[in-house]
Amino acid sequence: AGRVDDLISLINGDIPKGSWGIAHTRWATHGAPNSVNAHPHPDCHNNIFVVHNGIIENYRELKDKLLKEGHVFISDTDTEVLSHLIEKYFPAKGTGGSASPKGGKNNLEQAVIKALKLVKGAYGLAIVAQDDPGKIVAVKNSSPIVIGLGDGEAIVASDASAILTHTKQVVYLN
């Protein structure tokens, strides 16, 4: 939690290696602005991670139901509900669950669609799963999402100004 400049000094130049990732500068609407409530938010098995711009209006109702089903929450945010909802339809490998296999594999995009049918509110989301590496699912409802296309890369943001230093080629998700 804190300013981007603070993160840069915290990692001390030790930038993680990888081919995909998500992050979010959060405007706190649910839960205090602290490291526990900082994005991305994981599911119970640290498989699915979600960043979210918006407000989930029915998060309390959804969270109560998920708690009764045995989900464990670590934050006070509405966002964490999303990772647990998606987990119901895209469980981590070896954990069982109610996912509908497609071609013998769980399908992250279909899990997101199923989960979001239960959600009321405005959102711009970026979702990744360790069990489906290299893929970022971006989805929106009444909140902006822009995708920047660069040299061998795609960048998802809620505002074009966040990515214009990387690319001038942007597509607004409808």
Tell me the role of every PLM-derived stretch:
Residues A1-N174:
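Conserved short alpha-helical segments that host acidic/polar catalytic motifs at enzyme active sites
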